[in-house]
Structures are given as C-alpha cells and as structure tokens.
Amino acid sequence: MNKLTAEQIGYVSTYIQSFDIKWFELQVELTDHFVSIMEEIWIQDPELTFHQVKQIAEQRFGRNYFKEVEKERKMILQKEYNRQMRKTVTDFLKFPKIIGSILFGILLHNISFYFENPSEYIAGLFGLLFLFSVPINYVWFKNRKINGNRFLAVEISCGLVSVFPLFGSLAIFIKDEVKENPILIIPTICLWVVLFLFCISGIHLTNKVVSNIKKQYKLT
C-alpha cells in the first residue's frame, strides 16, 4: 500500500493537532505534507506497516517542526498583511483618490471653526477612531470560527483591534497640545485623516481575508 486511506489521513490530522496546531489552514498544509512524506517512505519500503511509516516520518520532522512552521507562517502572514495595509493606504494618497482625502481634511478643518474650543473638537475626532474597533471586533467575533475552524489569517488581520485603545490616550495628548499650540490643528487633522485611512483599510482587508478563506476552502 502506497496511498493512505481517509481514515489514516484523519489519524495523521489528529496527530498534527496534538502539537497545539489550532489553525485550520496549517492543519491542512501540515497534514498534506506529512502524508506525502509517509507515502514516499511507503513506496521505498512497501513492507512497512502504517505505524512504522508514521514513526519514520516523525523522526524526519522532529518534535519542534510543527510549532516552528506555525511561527514562521505567522511572520509571513503578518508581513503580507502589513504590506497590503501600506499599499491600500498609499492608494488613497495617490491621484485621483488623494483629492478626496484632501477635501475630507479641508472639511474637517472648516468644521473646527464652529467650535469655541478647537482642542475639544480634535480630541473628539481621535475619540471617534476608537469606534472603528466595533466593526473589526464584530468581523473577528463573527468569523473567529468558520464552520467550526479557526484560521490564522483571520486572527492576523484582526490584530489592528489591539491598537484602538491607544487612540484614547492619543486624544488626551493631542487635546493638550492643540490647546497650547492652535497652529497644530492642521497637521493634527492631516494625521487624523491618515489614521482614518488605516482604520477603513483594516476593515476592508479583514473582510477580504475572510472572503478569500471561504472561497479557498469552500466554506459558508
């Protein structure tokens, strides 16, 4: 026998999960890789039993291999997510989209004239950024498990949530700075627009990741 049965593949999958590999895409990838190694070993020596082949494959991989792959995959996905985030935000700062970003900034600046205390207005703007954690948290909670499975790519894409609490502290700091130096209103609004673009880009990328996963693994 050179090919593993569905039952044997299920046994290998359970073995992979025993190493605390909880992410579905990694479980599938590592199971496929382990199975292919076992089948290669079996072709070389068809007289071996399933458990003998599995033991030889285990020796090739080592005890730490699976967690090392998980760690490496996290780094790769994080770098790719950061790259996509930078690209998406940069697109908003290129012609013609930058015109909309500039007009939005001008609108925010003009609104500040209607406030007796512009520093309070600026603080409120940064406080509003915190509200973007609501849709991202919703997407994460809703898709934390898709068909009962957890995905590392979804977890990485929702990592932006951890940044939102900082906006509260930033709002207080900005408020004090603008109160002492009103000239900082314009650069502060520019900063706010960029952070706003990061927030909406984060929501867009998270939804995109979830959609791609559902298509790739044919999930609903």
Predicted regions: what they are:
Residues 86-220:
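Hydrophobic alpha-helical bundles in membrane proteins
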